[in-house]
Curated annotation (Swiss-Prot):
GO molecular function terms attached to this record: metal ion binding; ubiquinol-cytochrome-c reductase activity
Biological processes per GO annotation: mitochondrial electron transport, ubiquinol to cytochrome c
Other comments on record: Heme 1 (or BL or b562) is low-potential and absorbs at about 562 nm, and heme 2 (or BH or b566) is high-potential and absorbs at about 566 nm.
Taxonomic superkingdom: Eukaryota
Protein name as catalogued: Cytochrome b
Chief location category: mitochondrion
One Pfam match: Cytochrome_B
Location of this chain's protein in the cell: Mitochondrion inner membrane
Keyword Electron transport annotated: yes
Statement: the UniProt record of this protein carries the keyword Secreted: no
Cofactor, free-text remark: Binds 2 heme b groups non-covalently.
Length: 380
């Protein structure tokens, strides 16, 4: 038999073992599509981002007009920008669903894969934040000032740290320049960590909805899951294109159509929708350092999830009590997202505080307790 280059060539062999002949569980559902969708999001964002960077000027006097110029005068510049801005939203939708899938089906028990995933989430959040500053609109400036200022809550070194990050005594030209450098660099860092994420995943193989070993029943990735991934891609690209073409500014803030002015503060500084849940947790603590710690904890708590798994079963498929708790957590996050978009006044303050408290309570206390209870129930 003639040697197959796909299986013998050093580079093609790696691609083959990762994307073609990879043995995959036969029963993984559409919830397992989001990994490949995230890869597609990253590819799209890097491509559109490169095209935008070719027309962008990282200078406080020119940034806003260079973005306007891209939209007005560059061939399809408006489309590239709208795809890039809304592509970020879809990136976050996919990553939230991907994390939710991991929580529900106990995928976090692959600790290395889970931890690299959390690092990817943090890097993505950093990338989105520095990217939002680049158009240099009012909300870009306000957001940059507020969020970088949070570092000043760190005892002793805080103030020095903030001024070091700013490159001066306020958010100014050096800040914009370094944010552009970071926004250009970080997506490639994400691509690198993604490869590590995949290496760890392929050490164990995929989990499945039943949470049991699938070694006895594997199917090749191609054509089954390659085709399924293409279907997932079309189902994601359709709403993305619809949003970018019909309502490109739906998720944006009108304040960002005004060029940045350090002398005027927007009435309500709020981040993009995908940060609102964390922003609500930050605001619900009436102390700067406490708020910053809660903000960090809201995402870093994911690192604790594997250690809080007390159930004898891996997935929640056959655990109705944990399922109820899971959907309560989802509803709780939606409430936090909504509260984060509202002004700081009654009743939103108390709603935010209650939602923040219940967020941590569900994850740290109720999940382990419920799992232990279910274990006892299964024994009878």
């Amino acid at each position: 038999m003639a040697p197959n280059i796909r299986k013998s060539h050093p580079l093609l062999k790696m691609i083959n073992n990762s994307l073609i002949d990879l043995p995959a569980p036969s029963n993984i559902s559409a919830w397992w599509n989001f990994g490949s969708l995230l890869a597609m999001c990253l590819a799209t964002q890097i491509l559109t981002g490169l095209l935008l960077a070719m027309h962008y000027t990282a200078d406080t006097t020119l940034a806003f007009s260079s973005v306007a110029h891209t939209c007005r005068n560059v061939q399809y510049g408006w489309l590239i920008r709208n795809l890039h801005a809304n592509g970020a939203s879809f990136f976050f939708i996919c990553i939230f669903l991907h994390i939710g899938r991991g929580l529900y089906y106990g995928s976090y028990l692959y600790k290395e894969t889970w931890n690299t995933g959390v690092i990817l989430l943090l890097t993505l959040m950093a990338t989105a934040f520095v990217g939002y500053v680049l158009p240099w609109g009012q909300m870009s400036f306000g957001g940059a000032t507020v969020i970088t200022n949070l570092f000043s809550a760190i005892p002793y070194i805080g103030q020095a740290l903030v001024e070091w990050a700013w490159g001066g005594f306020s958010v100014d030209n050096p800040t914009l320049t370094r944010f552009f450098a970071l926004h250009f660099l970080l997506p490639f860092v994400i691509a690198g960590i993604t490869i590590i994420h995949l290496i760890f995943l392929h050490e164990s193989g995929s989990n499945n909805p039943l949470g049991i070993s699938s070694n006895s029943d594997k199917i090749p990735f191609h054509p089954y899951y390659s085709l399924k991934d293409i279907l997932g891609l079309t189902l994601m690209l359709t709403p993305l294109l619809t949003l970018a073409l019909f309502s490109p500014n739906l998720l944006g803030d009108p304040e960002n159509f005004t060029p940045a002015n350090p002398l005027v503060t927007p009435p309500h500084i709020k981040p993009e929708w995908y940060f609102l849940f964390a922003y609500a947790i930050l605001r619900s603590i009436p102390n700067k350092l406490g708020g910053v710690l809660a903000l960090a904890a809201s995402v870093l708590i994911l690192l604790l999830i594997p250690f809080l798994h007390k159930s004898k079963q891996r997935t929640m498929t056959f655990r109705p009590l944990s399922q109820t708790l899971f959907w309560l957590l989802v509803a709780n996050l939606l409430v936090l997202t909504w509260v984060g978009s509202q002004p700081v006044e009654h009743p939103f303050i108390i709603i935010g505080q209650m939602a923040s408290f219940s967020y941590f309570t569900i994850l740290l206390i109720l999940f382990p307790m419920t799992s232990t209870l279910e274990n006892k129930m299964f024994n009878h």
